[in-house]
From Swiss-Prot:
It comes from Seriola quinqueradiata (Five-ray yellowtail). This is SH3 domain-binding protein 4. Keywords: Coated pit, Cytoplasmic vesicle, Endocytosis, Membrane, Nucleus, Repeat, SH3 domain. The gene is sh3bp4. GO terms for molecular function: GDP-dissociation inhibitor activity. GO terms for biological process: cellular response to amino acid stimulus; endocytosis; negative regulation of cell growth; negative regulation of cell population proliferation; negative regulation of GTPase activity; negative regulation of TOR signaling; positive regulation of autophagy; protein localization to lysosome. The keyword Lipid biosynthesis does not apply.
Length: 966
C-alpha cells in the first residue's frame, strides 16, 4: 500500500502504522500531532476493513482526469484515465481511494465520478459496484486457506460514517460519546492479538463473532455463520486487494485466520498463557488503557513460537528494510542511510524558499539479473531514491562505498560504472558524472525523477570466451551472522552472504522450516559480519561451530553450500543452522566460529562472533549496574561447569604464506619515533597482512594505513606509499620470514602496557575455558600435576582453571625471578595458542577500556564530548556514584566514571571489538593534546585485533568441530 509503506522515518513526530491491522493508538481528546501529512487526517487502520461488502464493495468508482505525481508517500499515484475506487470522500480536498493494488490519498479535483446520479460526494455511504477482480491473480496469491462455515455480514454505519465502529466501548482511546455495554455475543469467541494464544474450536451455532483488528473488539468485522457452504476465504481473496497482493500479514490478520480455521490447534507456546486484558478487570479507564498498551507492546514483539522453529529464539518482528525518510527545506543538507556507507547530499537552494522536499533512500539487497553476468557484476546495493517535490533547482550528489578494486593489469579493459534506471529491473544506463576515489563512489544525479534506482557495477569491455569480469577485479564478499535478540536452549542462526559491503542490522527470513505459507517472515538481528576476497564465482561451503561443549550445531547442518551461480547472480544467500544446548538449565552466551571453504576444500576465511546473552530472569533489579566485585564476593561467584572437558587444537609454528606484497614508493624516516609506525626506504618491498585499510592519525593528519611486515618488524605503513604487486614473493624481499611464532610475539607487544582487573579476568576465564590441562600446557606448565597449582583436590574444572591462573599471577609478580614476565602478555599468548580468539578479543577490549579510563582520568569529559556528545547533566550522572561526602570525585577515583562511560559507550557501538577500538582511537586523536601522542600502545592493540584472523588461519590446521574450540 502506498499509504502504509513507510517502515521507518527520521521524523520525530508521530509515524504511520506499519501495517493496516496493527492499529493507530490515538486519544482523540488529546489531538493528533502532525506527521508527514499536512492538514490531512489519516483514517485509523481499523477502518480499512476486511469486510468486502461494506468496505471495498462500498467504494465509489471514479475516473482520473489528470495525472497525479505523488508529493507524499501517502498519496496514490495514478495517470489520466485510470479507474479508482473512493473509500472515504468526507474531506473537502483529499479523498481516500484504492486502485485494486494500493491505497492512498487522491486530490478530489483530479477525478470525476463515472456517472452523475449523485452530484455530491460527501455521503460516503453511497455504493457503486466495484470492477471485476482478477481471479487468477487472487488464486496465485491465495495464502489464507479456506474459512468454511462463515460469511461476512455488512457493518452498519453511524451517521453515514464508514470509519466509526459500532462497538467502540472497549476502545480506551476513544473519549466522548455514549458508552454502550459490551455485546455479550461477541465474547463467545474472542480472538486475541497474540497469534499463539490457545484457541477454542469454532462454534457453529454462535450468533456473532467479533474479530479484533487493532487489538480489541471494535465491531469492525462481524461474521455470522449463515451458510456452511459459503466461505469467507473466497470473498476476502477475490475482493480484497490486500489479501491478493500482500507478501506478508500482520499478527492480527493471522489471528483472524487461525480463529476461523476448521481445526484450530491448541498452542503450547512459550507465551501461551499471555491474554489480552478485558475492560471489566479494571476499576478505571486509565488502568485499562495502561494494561492494554503494555499487552500490545509485548504482543507486537512476539510470534507463535511453535510455528517458528519450536523454540523461543524467534520472537523478533521489527521492520528489516534499511531505509530512511527525511524532509529537507531550501537550506539543503545530507541524508545518511542508517548502518550503511550511503548518503545523499542536497545543496542549498535545491528547492524554493518556503518549500520542502521529502527524500527516501532504501538499500535493496538483491540486485536485478541484468546487472550480473559474465561481463558485469554489482559491487554495491541497489539504492532506491524517491523524491516528493519535483520543482527543484539543482542536482543532488549520491555517495556510496563499494567493495571492489580493479586490478592494475586490467584497468584498460575493466572499469567501475555507476548506472541508474527508473525501474528496479532495468534497463540501466551509465551515469557520466561519477567520480571514484579509493573505495568511495560519488555521482552527480541530474534529470531527477520521483523514483530512481542507482547501483555501482564493475564491467569489462571485452573478455575472453571462458573468462568473467571477476578475473579482472578484486571483489569482496560480506558474510553476516544473524540470530535472535536473546539465545535460548534451542534456537536458529542464519549466515547470509552479500555481494557487497552492506549487511543490514536486521534480516528478513521467511523460510524457517516446513511452515504454512501464512506464517509471517521473521526479522533477525546482526551478530557480526566479515569480509573476504573471492577470486571467482564458485561453490562455497560455510561451516558454523561452537566454542562451548554445552552448545552444538546439528551435525548434518554444520557445513552448508552456497552454489556458484548464486554468487555470480549477486543474490543474498541465507543459510539456516540449528543450535541446541545439551543442558537446557545451563544457558549462557558463547562464541561461534564461521569457516568458509572453496570447492577445493581450502579455507578462504574464518571469523568469530559472540552470541547475545540469554533473556534476563525475572526478579528484583538494581538501579545501578555494578561492574566491580568486592573481595568477599570473588569466592562466591556462581559457576556453570561445562558438560564435558573441551579439547583444543595444536598451535603450529610455521611460515605464513598467504601474504600480499607491496612496493614502497617513498622513503619515510620519522622524527618522532613510534614503534607501531614503520620506517622504510623507497624501492623496498613490504609484506601486507591484510588488504583492509585502517584509518589512523599520523603525525598531522588522519590517513589510511596497511598493516605491514618490514625487515622483521610489524607495524602500520601509509597506504599511499605502497603499490600492491600481488601474492608472489619478490626476489629482493629482505628480512626474516614471518612465522606464526614471530607473528604472535609481534602482535602482543602492547599487551604488557595494558591495565586489568584480576577478579574480572578470573571470572571470565573460569566461565569460558573448559580444560585446565590444555590451559596449563599453553602457559608452559607442561605435564605438571594438579597438586603443583593447588593443595586441595578441586572438584570442578573452572576451579582448576582458576588455580592455574593464580599460579601464573604468582610467577609474574615474583621479584626474585631472573626473567620478569608480563601477566597480560603470557595470558593472551596462551589463549591464542589454544585458539581462544573470541576470548582474547573480549579481554583485550576490557583491557583497552580500563587503560584508557586510567590514562584519561579527569580529562574523560573531553573524550565523552568527542565520542558521543554527552551533555553536562549526563556527565554529572556518571560521576554521582563516585562522589565523596563533600560532593567531589577524588582525583585518584576519577578513572571510575571514565570507565563507566566507556563501557556504556562501547555497548552502544555494537559487538565488534575492532570497531570499538578503532572509534576510541579516532576519538582520542581528536582531543586537544591527545594522550595517544605519549601513550602509543592503543595503536598497537589495533594491530593485534586486526591480525588475529590471519594468525588463526595460518597457525591451526582445519580440524573436526568436536576437536576444536575458540
Amino acid at each position: 500500500m502506498a499509504a502504509h509503506r513507510i517502515r521507518a522515518t527520521t521524523n520525530n513526530n508521530t509515524s504511520l502504522p506499519r501495517c493496516k491491522s496493527e492499529g493507530t493508538l490515538i486519544d482523540l481528546s488529546e489531538g493528533v500531532s502532525e506527521a508527514s501529512l499536512t492538514d490531512v487526517k489519516v483514517p485509523s487502520p481499523s477502518a480499512l476493513r476486511l469486510d468486502a461488502t461494506a468496505s471495498f464493495g462500498a467504494a465509489r468508482e471514479v475516473v482520473a482526469i489528470k495525472d497525479c505525481c505523488p508529493s507524499s508517500f501517502t498519496t496514490l499515484k495514478f495517470s489520466k484515465g485510470d479507474r479508482l475506487y473512493v473509500l472515504d470522500s468526507s474531506g473537502a480536498e483529499w479523498w481516500y481511494a484504492h486502485n485494486n493494488t494500493e491505497m492512498g490519498y487522491i486530490p478530489a479535483a483530479y477525478v470525476e465520478p463515472i456517472n452523475y446520479r449523485d452530484s455530491s460526494f460527501s455521503d460516503s455511504g453511497m455504493i457503486d459496484t466495484v470492477g471485476d477482480c482478477n481471479e487468477e491473480a487472487a488464486k496465485e496469491m491465495d495464502l489464507l486457506g479456506e474459512w468454511a462455515g462463515v460469511i461476512l455480514k455488512p457493518t452498519t454505519f453511524q451517521n453515514g460514517n464508514p470509519f466509526a465502529a459500532t462497538n467502540s466501548s472497549t476502545n480506551p482511546f476513544l473519549n466522548g460519546g455514549p458508552q454502550s455495554p459490551l455485546d455479550q455475543n461477541s465474547n463467545e469467541k474472542s480472538v486475541d492479538l497474540l497469534l499463539f494464544d490457545t484457541l477454542a474450536p469454532s462454534v457453529p451455532n454462535s450468533t456473532s463473532i467479533t474479530a479484533d483488528i487493532n487489538g480489541f473488539g471494535s465491531g469492525v468485522l462481524n461474521m455470522n455463520p449463515l451458510s456452511p457452504t459459503v466461505g469467507v476465504g473466497q470473498t476476502l481473496r477475490r475482493d480484497n486487494p490486500f489479501f491478493r497482493s500482500k507478501r506478508s500479514y500482520s499478527l492480527s490478520e493471522l489471528s483472524i485466520l487461525q480463529a476461523q480455521s476448521d481445526a484450530p490447534q491448541a498452542s503450547t507456546g512459550f507465551f501461551g498463557g499471555l491474554k489480552a486484558p478485558a475492560p471489566e478487570q479494571f476499576q478505571s479507564r486509565e488502568d485499562f488503557r495502561t494494561a492494554w498498551l503494555t499487552h500490545r507492546k509485548l504482543a507486537r514483539s512476539c510470534h507463535d513460537l511453535d510455528s517458528l522453529g519450536q523454540n523461543p529464539g524467534w520472537g523478533q518482528t521489527q521492520p528489516v528494510e534499511t531505509n530512511i525518510v527525511c524532509r529537507l527545506d531550501s537550506s539543503g543538507g545530507a541524508v545518511q542511510l542508517p548502518d550503511a556507507n550511503i548518503s545523499i547530499h542536497i545543496p542549498e537552494g535545491h528547492v524554493a524558499p518556503g518549500d520542502t522536499q521529502q527524500i527516501s533512500i532504501k538499500a535493496l539487497l538483491d540486485p536485478p539479473l541484468e546487472l550480473n553476468n559474465d561481463r558485469c557484476t554489482t559491487v554495491s546495493p541497489v539504492v532506491e531514491i524517491k523524491l516528493s517535490n519535483m520543482e527543484i533547482r539543482t542536482t543532488v550528489t549520491l555517495e556510496m562505498k563499494v567493495s571492489v578494486v580493479v586490478k592494475i593489469e586490467s584497468r584498460q579493459t575493466t572499469e567501475i560504472l555507476c548506472v541508474r534506471s527508473d525501474c528496479k529491473e532495468g534497463p540501466y544506463t551509465p551515469i557520466p558524472q561519477a567520480y571514484i576515489y579509493g573505495d568511495m563512489v560519488q555521482v552527480c544525479l541530474d534529470n531527477l525523477e520521483p523514483c530512481m534506482y542507482v547501483c555501482v557495477v564493475a564491467q569489462s569491455k571485452s573478455i575472453a570466451p571462458d573468462s568473467t569480469v571477476w578475473e579482472h577485479v578484486v571483489k569482496k564478499i560480506t558474510l553476516g551472522v544473524y540470530g535472535p535478540k536473546h539465545i535460548h536452549p534451542s534456537f536458529k542462526t542464519v549466515v547470509a552472504m552479500f555481494g557487497h559491503d552492506c549487511a543490514p542490522k536486521t534480516l528478513l527470513v521467511s523460510e524457517v522450516g516446513k511452515q504454512a505459507q501464512a506464517v509471517p517472515p521473521v526479522a533477525l538481528q546482526l551478530w557480526g559480519k566479515h569480509q573476504f576476497v573471492l577470486s571467482r564465482p564458485q561453490d562455497l561451503r560455510v561451516g558454523v561451530y561452537s566454542n562451548m561443549a554445552n552448545y552444538e550445531v546439528k551435525a548434518s547442518e554444520q557445513a552448508r553450500v552456497v552454489r556458484g551461480f548464486q554468487v555470480k547472480l549477486g543474490k543474498v544467500s541465507r543459510l539456516v543452522y540449528v543450535i541446541a544446548s545439551r543442558n537446557a538449565d545451563d544457558v549462557s552466551d558463547f562464541t561461534l566460529r564461521i569457516q568458509i571453504k572453496d570447492d577445493q576444500d581450502c579455507i578462504l576465511a574464518q571469523f568469530c562472533v559472540q552470541t547475545p546473552t540469554p533473556p534476563p530472569k525475572a526478579g528484583p533489579k538494581t538501579s545501578v549496574q555494578r561492574r566491580f566485585l568486592k573481595k568477599k564476593e570473588v569466592g562466591k561467584i556462581v559457576l556453570s561447569p561445562l558438560a564435558i572437558t573441551t579439547k583444543y587444537p595444536v598451535f603450529q609454528d610455521r611460515r605464513i604464506n598467504n601474504l600480499k606484497f607491496g612496493k614502497l614508493i617513498k622513503t619515510v624516516i620519522r622524527q618522532t619515533k613510534n614503534q607501531y609506525l614503520l620506517e622504510y626506504k623507497k624501492g623496498d618491498f613490504v609484506a601486507l597482512l591484510s588488504e583492509e585499510k585502517i584509518r589512523l592519525k599520523g603525525q598531522l593528519w588522519t590517513k589510511e594505513w596497511y598493516i605491514g611486515y618490514y625487515q622483521g618488524r610489524l607495524g602500520f605503513v601509509h597506504a599511499k606509499n605502497v603499490l600492491v604487486v600481488g601474492k608472489v614473493k619478490p626476489i629482493y624481499f629482505s628480512g626474516p620470514d614471518l612465522t606464526t611464532s614471530l607473528f604472535l610475539e609481534q602482535i602482543l607487544k602492547p599487551c604488557k602496557f595494558l591495565t586489568y582487573i584480576y577478579a574480572s579476568v578470573r571470572t571470565i576465564l573460569m566461565e569460558n575455558i573448559g580444560n585446565w590441562r590444555a590451559f596449563a600446557d599453553s602457559l608452559g606448565y607442561i605435564n605438571l600435576p594438579l597438586t603443583h597449582f593447588c593443595r586441595a583436590e578441586l572438584d570442578s574444572e573452572p576451579e582448576r582453571v582458576a588455580s592455574v591462573l593464580e599460579k601464573l599471577k604468582e610467577d609474574c609478580n615474583n621479584t626474585e625471578s631472573k626473567e620478569r614476565k608480563s601477566f597480560q602478555k603470557e595470558l593472551l599468548t596462551a589463549l591464542l595458542k589454544m585458539d581462544c580468539q573470541g576470548l582474547v578479543a573480549r579481554l583485550v577490549m576490557d583491557f583497552v577500556l580500563l587503560t584508557t579510563a586510567v590514562e584519561l582520568a579527569g580529562r574523560w569529559r573531553e573524550l565523552a564530548e568527542k565520542l558521543a556528545k554527552v551533555s553536562r547533566q549526563q556527565m554529572d550522572a556518571y560521576e554521582a556514584p563516585h562522589r565523596d561526602k563533600s560532593g567531589v570525585v577524588d582525583s585518584e577515583a576519577m578513572w571510575k566514571p571514565a570507565y563507566d562511560f566507556l563501557v556504556t559507550w562501547a555497548a552502544q557501538i555494537g559487538d565488534s571489538y575492532r570497531d570499538v577500538i578503532q572509534e576510541l582511537h579516532m576519538g582520542l586523536d581528536k582531543m586537544k593534546n591527545p594522550i595517544t601522542k605519549r601513550w602509543k600502545h592503543l595503536t598497537g592493540t589495533l594491530i593485534l585485533v586486526n591480525c588475529m584472523d590471519a594468525l588463526r588461519s595460518s597457525a591451526f590446521s582445519p580440524a573436526a568441530q568436536d576437536d576444536c574450540a575458540i
